[in-house]
Amino acid sequence: MDKNIKILIVDDFSTMRRIIKNLLRDLGYNNTYEADDGATALPMLEAGDFKFVVTDWNMPIMQGIDLLRAIRKSSKLKSIPVLM
């Protein structure tokens, strides 16, 4: 896998986002972005060229499962791998 791919980390807890970002960085993935819920993440995904999403399940405003459903409904986003 290309180490320069854009990865979006979605979690309402900033500490968890930082932990995931640090783990990815340790693996050589430095092109990471963050969102604090699905409602913030979805426009970022639609506007960006993200290749992978790591998301929490339980978040305010838009839960992870609802974000996943929106990603799978979108013809532009449906092929992006999502780790929950």
Give the residues covered by each predicted segment.
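His-Asp phosphorelay/catalytic-motif detector in bacterial-type signaling
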Residues: 4, 49-51, 76-81
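Conserved acidic carboxylate
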Residues: 11
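Two-component/phosphorelay signaling modules centered on CheY-like receiver
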Residues: 14-33
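Acidic, metal-coordinating helix/loop segments flanking the phosphotransfer/catalytic sites
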Residues: 34-52
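Acidic catalytic/metal-coordinating carboxylates
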Residues: 37-40, 63-69
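Active-site residues of response regulator receiver
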Residues: 56
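Receiver (REC) domain active-site loop signature in two-component systems and cognate sites
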Residues: 59
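A short, hydrophobic beta-strand element within the central beta-sheet of small alpha/beta folds
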Residues: 69, 79-84
